[in-house]
Amino acid sequence: MYKELILFRNELKNKSIPKYKIIGIVSELLLSKQVFLKNSDIEDFLKDIFGLEFKAYLFKSRTLLIARVTKEIISMEKDNEYKNKLYKFVQGKIDELKDNERKEKNQLDGWI
């Protein structure tokens, strides 16, 4: 997932990004069990990034959730604001994965 996050970050760096790319990035993130272990984790992400709140039944199915989020992204007006928030989120996940990788390497060094 680390390589995909790097690609997403590079796409989000562009000044103008088409909505279909934002939809693709968000869909990949929502479907990833490495980024969101539990469906309940997605709820905070959607509130922070897009300001979206859905009923509880939608969070039982990631595919239903993606359909609703896609619908909202298509109708949204503040593309740049959401793109910047999404960029910060992806960058945070990249940093988190780097830190986890370093910790694993440090633990293995003790055994050698």
Give short role names for the model-derived ranges.
Residues 1-112:
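Basic helix-extension-helix modules of the SAP/HeH family
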